[in-house]
Amino acid sequence: MTMTTTNYGADQIQVLEGLEPVRKRPGMYIGSTGPKGLHHLVYEVVDNAIDEALAGYCTHIEIDINADGSVTVVDNGRGIPTDIHPTTGRSALETVLTVLHAGGKFGGGGYKVSGGLHGVGVSVVNALSEWVEVKVWRQGKEHFQRFERGNPIGTLEATPNEGHSTGTQVSFLPDTQIFKDGIEFDYHTLASRLKELAYLNAGVRITFGDRRADSLKEEQFYYEGGIREYVTYMTTDKTPLHEEIIYTSGEKNDVQVEVALQWCVDAYSDTLLGFANNIRTIDGGTHLEGLKAVLTRTLNSVARKRNKLKDGDSNLGGENIREGLTGVISVKVPDPEFEGQTKTKLGNTEVRGIVDTLVGEALTEFLEFNPGVADAIIEKAVQAFKAAEAARRARELVRRKSVLESSTLPGKLADCSSKDPSESEIFIVEGDSAGGCFSGDTLVALTDGRSVSFEQLVEEEKQGKQNFCYTIRHDGSIGVEKIINARKTKTNAKVIKVTLDNGESIICTPDHKFMLRDGSYKCAMDLTLDDSLMPLHRKISTTEDSGITIDGYEMVWSPRSDSWLFTHLVADWYNRWQGIYIAEEKQHCHHKDFNKRNNNPDNLIRLSPEKHLALHRKHISKTLHRPDVVEKCRRIHQSPEFRRKMSARMQSPETRAILSKQAQAQWQNETYKLTMMESWRSFYDSNEDYRQQNAEQLNRAQQEYWAQAENRTAQAERVRQHFAQNPGLRQQYSENAVKQWNNPELLKWRQKKTKEQWTPEFREKRREALAQTYYRKTLAALKQVEIENGYLDISAYDSYRISTKDKSLLRFDRFCERYFENDENLAREAVLNYNHRIVNIEAVSETIDVYDIEVPHTHNFALASGVFVHNSAKQGRDRRFQAILPLRGKILNIEKTDDAKIYKNTEIQALITALGLGIKGDDFDISSLRYHRVVIMTDADVDGAHIRTLLLTFFYRYQRDLVDQGYIYIACPPLYKLERGKNHFYCYSDRELQEQISQFPPNANYTIQRFKGLGEMMPQQLWDTTMNPESRTMKRVHIEDAAEADRIFTVLMGDRVAPRREFIETYGTKLDLTDLDI
């Protein structure tokens, strides 16, 4: 340290402006009023103590977080001057604390170099604190003064200081009126910065204590070796190329330069930390530019002197030479010029030349005296150069391939429509289910009666044709939905072949999801022979079937009701839901093209019966009503033979039976039955005479029934036998009733509660829920019996039902009676159509191009092979500004590889191409970034955490500017959905789940759904919880402690196992992403 010879007094405190603006616009001075700005207050006070250390007057700084949340900073420097300031007429201490930009650096007398400035930072701290107390030990006295919200309380007090020590103590409590998010300091955030300062100022001891009741800890940071020890700390878990750290320090034109360097064998990127006046310059600056230039020039010069590079060889690039380098450069500049208010880039042009000169001389000398180290560094740089050339060739190959495919973006990127990077965001997700799907010749079942391949769908979409598919709606019923965005998603994809129990085969990617019978999804590669798949069944109507009155129309099986529905009625519902038209009573559905198999919603219109019949009459004049056809029919109907046949037919028992059956079938038709019931109800409600007559008739009937002695006797006998078989029951009932209901208030309360609970709606919902439970369990068991026996063996089912003792499995006759109106054929049909099964899954050796479509709202569709599959390509996003990039599996661990292998990796190729960036040197241009929010969105499991770490490693090592400039985010999807009654809550941690449950009554009923992966969420859930900017939670990634971040990436992603195991065992169980300040 260099000590100044001038005195440090009040006349060296220069006043520039007042303090009033600080409280009005605190963000201009400390960056924000959040956690970052709060901790900046501490840094400003500590920087003042560091200034004393830089000037050579301070060796020990003590920082304490006090029990009341305030902070105290003590140094053993000279102490803030206390004599009267010539300009303000107040003490220098009061001037320093109350006047903005009153500091010891201005005017040049107090400090030779300075980061934080006495009076510049501390006055801001004073303005933004509820109170500040300052003690100064100087000139044999202890001086004290208190300030509140920037205003002095009283005058400077002085008492004798027997010890004649010197120094300054500043205590402050941040103002909650300014820091509305809280004033709690984070120990680790402060410790990280203080440790960094101790490395940068060799020989200065920094003591940091936390005196809060729940913490009580203390650390000391003292590094005699300064930045040399800093480099040693960062390379602890790496393998050094040379044991001795290359170190130099020097001074020129009052600029002090200190550099420490070490190359490592097992690192493929560089970590260079730059500091100017103890301030981390994350955006670089002239000092780092000078260091990089001198490293490149010096190493190339040494390489040629030692014949490592021949005359015809090109120079090694700066990236080649710096591969594997860990270094720290710290400069102390008398008049620093920082670009931007955050002081993150040094702008002094003279510093570049000074660094170049001082480091060049020292580095050349070191390498000349250590030829083995020189050779090792150059050899690693040469290998890096060769790898870069291989990477360049691989990169060019990727570019040429993209040009040949007429696309510069990866095929599986589901891009957004916006071209404005500032509003665009990309979600990097797991799995190919968001990209590749089916072979191009796979057929999709369409509602126009066709089965069309994915390739044909792409072509028809280009031609402007709108197609519609079958889908399972959110309530489990069959529906139709439009198809959009038919496209090829990936080339040369690995696929598997799935064979169904109906003999159909499907070629798809291994992780594409199939819909199970219960509405959930499962990846193709995970399907088993026991899985029950959601089926698609279609048939053509015939009047020979019970209740069917029209021939030749398509019908589709609805899994929710286990019944056949006319497809045109399902499409009609879609039109009404979309508001295409409003359904009115007694309207008819009409196929525009007169093709009753084309059930596309846009082929349907609704007409009044009169218009519909008129349209058909108009059309029929060209078919059945041609004159020749009419005349032929007339002659037939008038013939005696025809009349005899019709008469005989009407009188035959078979015809009478048919007519009777048709009449009964009408009453099995739910629509007909509902119409008749509504008609009767309308008649009943509007006919008071009939209601009175009906009531009298019912009353007369029950009187007549109970007037007969045998009826009264029979009922009395039933009651008598019941109590005879249970002798103690009468007394027990009596006693219980007396105990329970002798309190009138209790009786009144119970009556009220019962009335509230057992509403008609509640009774109906309870009945439906029980009915569905019995229905689903019985149907599934019957289907299993059919599969195991090859046919529906009722006796086998009864044996199974009895053996399980499951009361919810109904007898087959009861099942038919309750749900199928005693029609066994209908029940057997429901069992037959219940599901599909897998019979085989096998790998396919060749790779193929794969395709996908997008299905809005429901995100599933039916294949012509008879099963429903998931459309997961772009669920739950806003296509205007949100893009999705799926990555298959875990990307390459770049911590263990070189550039050539990185560029050959398919997933990294897709990533860097989608972002619009290269990864190093001239290739990397941050201005070309296509999205200003790059969001890592992985599952909440071990694999998801690993993939997230691999991606963060890649960005940190190879696209560091994305991290430094705040473009990288981590999505925080919920872990649980908690449902109670009609309300639901999303919980993002176990703690949040337990807190929510604790708010329920002790006997509350609730259900918990654990989201193991994003694929388990419905699209709307994913949007509401994770992707909607209005409601989501995302963590922005930034680096506070660069050295610690570098070390952690090395530990977690490097080759050495022992440090990684120790780290995971120490911290693994403590990590909660939702609490993590990333």
Swiss-Prot record:
Cellular component, GO annotation: chromosome; cytoplasm
Residue positions binding Mg(2+) 1: E895, D939
UniProt cofactor(s): Mg(2+)
Ranges for domain Toprim: 889-974
Record-listed Mg(2+) 2 binding positions: D939, D941
Keyword Heme: no
Similarity comment: family membership: Belongs to the type II topoisomerase GyrB family.
Protein name as it appears in the record: DNA gyrase subunit B
